[in-house]
Amino acid sequence: DSAVASAASRMVSAAKDRPCMDMGGRRTNEWAAVAAARAAVIGGFQGTANLLAAQLYGLKAIGTAAHCFTLVHDDERSAFASQVEALGRNTTLLVDTYNVEEAVKTAVEVAGPQLGGVRIDSGDLAAMAQRVRNQLDALGATNTKITVTNDLDEYALAALQSAPVDSYGVG
């Protein structure tokens, strides 16, 4: 637990004023994920996608949909519509399951310019975040937040400081 809390603390320091959130439950067994989520929050993360850890330890539950959520729908539009219907426009939509540019366009069409956020989980995160920010702004979604995920550590977070990223999902 102390190794996870220490790593989380280093990531929070590298992230500066951008929040870090635990999304590591997909990478380890169930009970290790619960312990790691608690340790990450002790290290400064602002919440966890692990609902059991949130319940057991009174942590803030956060999260977005996974790629499998999009894949079980007929298309991205229906996946986004389902998520927005269930969680409201302030939700964060995962936009890199297929084609990022098309997904961002669809996300704003479905949720409107009040869309809470988008998540990018693959590719060159800095370059992709810049392209997505430009596209969101052009579509009128100027307040939509960008979260990036995918094998992040303190070095990756430091390298992303100049990118238009609002938060990090780690794990």
Language-model features: locations:
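Buried, small/hydrophobic-residue-enriched core segments of structured protein domains
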Residues: 1-143, 152-159, 163-164
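Glycine-rich phosphate-binding active-site loops on the catalytic face of alpha/beta enzymes
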Residues: 166-171
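Short hydrophobic "strand-cap" motifs at the C-terminus of beta-strands
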Residues: 149
